[in-house]
Regions:
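C-terminal alpha-helical cap/extension of soluble enzyme domains
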Residues: 3-10, 14-24, 43, 47-49, ...
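Catalytic alpha/beta core domains of metabolic enzymes, predominantly
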Residues: 134-138, 149-248, 252-256
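A general structural signal for well-ordered alpha-helical segments in protein cores
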Residues: 37, 69, 73, 98, ...
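Gly/Ser/Thr-rich helix-start
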Residues: 31, 57-60, 90-92, 198, ...
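Solvent-exposed, flexible loop/coil residues
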Residues: 27-30, 36, 68, 123-124, ...
Length: 305
């Protein structure tokens, strides 16, 4: 059984412990708003994030060109420098394309790569393993696997993750499949830094040995996640539980009613952080009923909206 990193005093995690999966701001004309992205990244670090995932699912990566992806990586890295880790979402369902984008991201100076399960193709586990290993071998950057079967259409089997953990560049897992037994198996048999990819499961996954969270809700509640994660790493369950329950209505507001990027952009706009709420098709704006439900949850969480 591998030793988990939980409660290790002074442990320096490769990607940090409170990471935001950043939205990609757009201008009213639909172009990427790199200036707003830089300002948002700076705010998130000021609020307590020590890692930022750029152009992942929440960053609407499937609607971005390669040049827009690279522009986002550069804008965020230039804004935050060494204050936090910048992880570039360079995974696609085309291995060769993923390698090309990863190499270009490395040239920009990002700190790591987030590689999602190859979606739509539905490869075998052998194909999934070969895909990840090829990308991880293409640069010197550390890699975080991203297991999200609800979007990819296929899960990474625990046995495949265990095999992948032996690759020297594969050091972390963003676990977004809500399969506690699978996560437990991975934690018990690897030295990967595991991150909750489901905001509401941060506490229970950390109780099993995960080291933090890659969160959408942290756009608007990073300081509270910092309290929760630091408390869990310190073994202070009472403080962590209190933060967990305080976060619950905020998590519902961001994640339960409309797509996370859509909700996050509206809340950030209400806060004055983003100048607009523009998303790219096929995402669309919420209905007024959905917006009011989001506001109701935020009020329950103590917000004045």
């Amino acid at each position: 059984m591998a030793e988990t990193a939980l409660h290790t005093p002074g442990k320096n995690y490769t990607f940090g412990t409170v990471l935001t999966a950043m939205v990609t701001p757009f201008k009213e004309n639909g172009e990427v708003d790199y200036e707003s992205a830089a300002k948002l990244a700076t705010k998130l670090v000021d609020d307590g994030c020590d890692g930022l995932v750029v152009t992942g699912t929440t960053g609407e990566t499937s609607t971005l060109t390669d040049e827009e992806n690279l522009g986002m990586f550069k804008a965020v890295k230039d804004a935050v420098g060494d204050r936090c880790k910048v992880i570039a979402g360079t995974g696609t369902n085309d291995t060769a394309h993923s390698i090309q984008l990863s190499k270009r991201a490395a040239e920009i100076g990002v700190d790591g790569l987030l590689i999602v399960t190859p979606y739509y193709n539905k490869p075998s586990q052998a194909g999934i393993q070969a895909h990840f290993e090829a990308i991880a071998s293409a640069t010197e950057l550390p890699v975080m696997l991203y297991d999200i079967p609800g979007r990819a259409g296929i899960a990474i089997a625990p046995e495949t993750i265990i095999a992948l953990s032996k690759h020297p560049k594969i050091v972390a897992l963003k676990d977004a499949k809500a399969d506690y037994q699978s996560t437990t198996t991975v934690l018990a048999n690897t030295d990967l830094d595991v991150y909750s990819g489901d905001d509401g499961l941060t506490l229970p996954l950390m109780a099993a040995g995960a080291v933090g969270v890659v969160s959408v809700t942290a756009h608007v509640a990073a300081a509270k996640y910092r309290i929760l994660v630091d408390a869990m790493l310190a073994g202070d369950l009472a403080t962590a539980r209190a933060a967990h329950f305080e976060l619950d209505p905020i998590q519902r507001a961001v994640m339960s009613h409309v797509q996370g990027a859509v909700a996050a952009k509206h809340i950030l706009n209400w806060q004055g952080v983003l100048p607009n709420t523009v998303v790219r098709l096929p995402l669309v704006a919420p209905s007024e009923t959905e917006l009011e439900t989001i506001r109701t949850d935020l009020r329950e969480g103590g917000w004045e909206i």
